[in-house]
């Protein structure tokens, strides 16, 4: 701002007194060279004044006269960034989709042509909401499957459920899906459990094991697999992909060639599926 004002002052002074910079001649009539130089000085002064006025007026124009233009510019930049992000995600999913599914639990028809990848956390309320929307979609479509990428970001509230469903997938894929639905629709810790952080992880795991037993899983084998390499590999894959795709929170959905951060309704999921190849 200071430099802009200084340039404006210089431009005004140059316009008013620029003639004093011209070389003096003995003739009363100005020479052709002085006339040209005078016009050049005036032109430079006008450019400096016009540029400075524009720079000083632009913030006022953007914020007071036409504030919507700023929002339009921001929205345009965000749309452009999202389009580029979607392009990178699409390219990766097309080449590495099978690898992304290798150790992950799957809901719906495992052989379906259309795939939804969802980064989710069992203790995230928005993830629970979008899970319900996904269940509504799957109930009406046999051409869609949902690949669960367990992005454990809430520590002891998330670790045991995430590991359990991945480990359950090694035992029985259908029961793994059933356990996923159960963990998303029922509480596996209480407000009382939260009062003692030192025992919270153990209490959460104990409750998860009760649910696993309820769906018919071998809980001894489940505990062993939860600490095995396959589970560790899948959790690494989830974190690595989150970093690659710049996923900072849950839920996050990839549907066809589009990415959706946050919980979205069933009709929006349906629309994205209809647009997907």
Residue ranges of model-derived segments:
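Extracytoplasmic thiol/disulfide redox context detector
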Residues: 2-159, 227, 231-244, 276-277
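Cysteine-centric redox/oxidoreductase cores and disulfide-bonded domains
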Residues: 153-250, 254-277
């Amino acid at each position: 701002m200071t430099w802009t004002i200084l340039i404006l002052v210089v431009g005004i002074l140059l316009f008013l007194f620029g003639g004093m910079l011209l070389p003096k001649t003995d003739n009363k009539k100005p020479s052709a060279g002085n006339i040209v130089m005078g016009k050049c000085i005036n032109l430079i002064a006008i450019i400096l004044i016009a540029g400075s006025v524009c720079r000083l007026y632009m913030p006022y124009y953007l914020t007071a006269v036409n504030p919507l233009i700023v929002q339009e510019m921001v929205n345009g930049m965000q749309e452009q960034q999202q389009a580029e992000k979607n392009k990178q995600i699409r390219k990766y999913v097309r080449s590495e989709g099978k690898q992304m599914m290798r150790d992950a639990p799957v809901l719906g028809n495992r052989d379906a042509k259309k795939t939804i990848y969802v980064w989710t956390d069992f203790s995230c309320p928005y993830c629970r909401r979008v899970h319900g929307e996904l269940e509504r979609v799957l109930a009406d479509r046999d051409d869609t499957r949902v690949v669960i990428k367990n992005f454990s970001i809430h520590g002891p509230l998330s670790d045991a459920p995430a590991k359990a469903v991945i480990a359950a997938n090694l035992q029985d894929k259908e029961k793994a899906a059933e356990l996923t639905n159960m963990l998303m629709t029922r509480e596996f810790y209480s407000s009382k459990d939260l009062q003692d952080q030192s025992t919270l992880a153990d209490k959460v795991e104990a409750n998860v094991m009760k649910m696993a037993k309820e769906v018919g899983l071998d809980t001894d084998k489940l505990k062993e697999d939860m600490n095995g390499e396959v589970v560790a590999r899948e959790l690494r894959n989830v974190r690595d992909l989150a970093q690659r795709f710049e996923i900072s929170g849950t839920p996050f959905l990839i549907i066809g060639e589009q990415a959706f951060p946050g919980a979205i309704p069933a009709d929006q999921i349906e629309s994205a599926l209809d647009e997907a190849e």
